[in-house]
Amino acid sequence: MPRRIVLSLAVAIAALLLGLVLLYAGYILMDAWMDLHAMPAAQTDTVDGNTISTVALEAKAAKVDSLSLDGAVMLDAMMDDLSSGGYTAACFDIKRADGTVGYASTLGTVAAAGAVSSPAGDLRSSCQKLGKNDLLVLGHIVCYPDNVQTAANPAWAVKSGKTAYTDPAGNRYLNPDSTEVYNYIRSLVEESVRAGVTVFVLEGTELPQAAGTFNHNGFADLSKRLTADLGQDVKFLQPVAVNITSTTTADLKKEVADKCTQNLNENQIYAITCPEKSRRAVKQLLDDRGCTCYLITE
């Protein structure tokens, strides 16, 4: 075979191989980009043409430690516990009542205040893994009680005279009328949404009467503003607090029947506090009553 033909074939084969390599690399990069930017499918679906913010949510949730969202061994153990207990959702702390943040936030305001504590180690991959196992992720935000940011940013605090208002238990509060406070809460939500969380339980939206009167106090106002800014694919739930103290079967049955009587709207969730040893029985009683949206914690 003439040398010119051999060289031409070699060049053609090399070009073909290079093209295949580049095509394969392109697919890998595209998959990586989609993993980085995609939201879990279970978190963004619509129901009968309605967005998640407008439908009644079915979530039988247990409160879990933020540390368990490590994307690895602790997450697997937590998912096993939820599945064996008949739960369909996990709820973790985004912002706690003391002002600490329960995930590895990169927000400058969080870092400057040193607010991160016992965080979820890998929130993004944990949300993806939970979604693949048909478990919904709920983010719990205690909105206005905050001893961390009120110390780091005194101008954000509710004032009593020239100093921060402090309740009898020593708690300070963020000012609901402050633009900076609203932007802070919104930033926490936005960052969590990017990691894969689309349902948020907003607690601590009402301030004590002694703290004063505010234009933007309350769940309805805050959730409306957040929905307007973030869109209809994010849902906000108002917790309806129920404290269960009984431990015997008969007493538990009566207490649950007496206290869980409210017909929840599409933006509410029962927030059940009960002794650890009663959790399984309380969950069964809620299921027997046809409750489909609740959060059980200790």
For every predicted segment, state its role.
Residues 1-22:
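N-terminal Sec-pathway targeting helices
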Residues 45, 96-141, 188, 207-234:
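Aromatic-lined substrate-binding rim segments of carbohydrate-active enzymes
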Residues 50-63, 144-190:
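Active-site-adjacent "subsite" loops/lids of carbohydrate-active enzymes
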Residues 136-146, 201-203, 218-252, 273-275, ...:
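Aromatic-lined carbohydrate-recognition surfaces of secreted/lumenal glycan-active proteins
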Residues 89-94, 119-165:
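Glycine-rich, aromatic-flanked loop segments that form ligand/cofactor-binding clefts
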Residues 73-101, 191-203, 258-271:
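Catalytic domains of carbohydrate-active enzymes, especially glycoside hydrolases
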Residues 31-60:
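N-terminal, intrinsically disordered, polar/charged segments of Gram-positive cell-envelope systems
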Residues 25-27, 31, 250-298:
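Substrate-binding cleft of secreted/luminal carbohydrate-active enzymes
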